[in-house]
Amino acid sequence: AHDCNIGNNTVLSHHVALAGHVEINDNAILSAMVGVVQFRRIGSYSMIGGLCAVDMDVSPFTIASGIDGSRAYINGVNIIGMKRKGFSKEEINCASEKLKLFFNDTDTYQKRLQKLQLISSNKVNNIIKDFLLKETKNGICHPKSLL
């Protein structure tokens, strides 16, 4: 790995491979044998399940995983990780609601981003907005089905 930025309190398990210019935000967890493609971003408080390939940006507060080395998909909200980091039930519900609204919306990606700009300001919303509103050339990792 070269020119990577790894945030505070981030856990990289054994055999994690980061290509160049990867950005991992604070409090993220990457399990064993995760491979991250160059120029990808991993959001705060997210968890990547073992033995998968991250080829798109992974949103904050999410769990992403694949099967036997396959592409990572969002599987849900990292509720246990948020509880362990001291988030209140209201904050966890807020993250869950905002991520469901974003990923389950049938509007275009640009319209979803416009809606995201309108949500109120608080710690959780700001982390989500700051990540998702930042330009990406890689796309955002998404669920295989609705959250």
Predicted regions mapped to residue ranges:
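Short, amphipathic C-terminal "tail helix"
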Residues: 117-147
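Glycine-rich hexapeptide-repeat left-handed beta-helix
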Residues: 14-123
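Right-handed parallel beta-helix/beta-solenoid
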Residues: 1-4, 17-19
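A positional/architectural concept
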Residues: 4-11, 28
